[in-house]
Amino acid sequence: MAYIEKDYIAVNHIEREFYFQGKYGSKGEKRDKKKHSSLEIKEYNHKQQEKKIRRLIQANFFEHDYYVTLKYKKGTRKDIKGFQDDLSKFLRIMRDKYKRLGVLFKFIYRIEIGKLGGPHVHIIFNRTQGTDTMIKDAWKRASEDAGSFQMETLDNENGFERLAAYICKQPDEEVKGQLKFALVEESNKKVFTVSTSRNLIRPEPVKKNYVHWTMKKILENGPTPTKGFKIDKDSIVTGINPFNGFTYLWYRESRIDPISREEYENGCKDKPICQHKRKISH
């Protein structure tokens, strides 16, 4: 029985997906199509978005890059246009500052409304010298309503899984209620959209097709990691995709000795240490 392997490869992480029809180790079975509820479809699409954002983070950001929350002064209320105008100006100022240093500015952001109706913005971006001072200056110049900001460094534990989940989280009913007071009704949906800079690496899977062996061996012995990587045991997931009937195996590998942004930008990407080679037994 043929199956497909899809590998999403980043410098410090590799995500592997195996898909095939039927039971593991046996000829495929045809399954009846099931009608799915709107809630099931919504949850499935949300998980797919989390995967997409997680892979974007893995492909473009490193441990010790920044996760920043920009806040407005207490009591500030703005519609979506006001949000976007302030944020666009902030990003433009930051981009210019990075450009003067000869550094490409990359980012992922999401505008959010707090439970008390306070607007704020979550942004992930690459680190460079003097970033904290840049943020303070750029935010004050971008908006007369600029308040405080919080800055944290990224932790690549679990392949940025928790970070991606937070960036993509759905608003609860309390927050949805606040939107009626904080924003124009027709603009609500835009608030929770994840946006990115155009210069991000967009990871595409490396696909492999196999017809000479089944998943029985890999299930019995367990998957084998790429040299220099370890398999995150908690990441191994098997099951059946309810939307296409394909049985799947998914897991993540993480580099044992992670490569830093400095190592990568100083030419590591052109050296063997940044390349991944893995043997597959047939």
Model-identified regions with their sequence ranges:
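Right-hand nucleic-acid polymerase module
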Residues: 1-117, 127-282
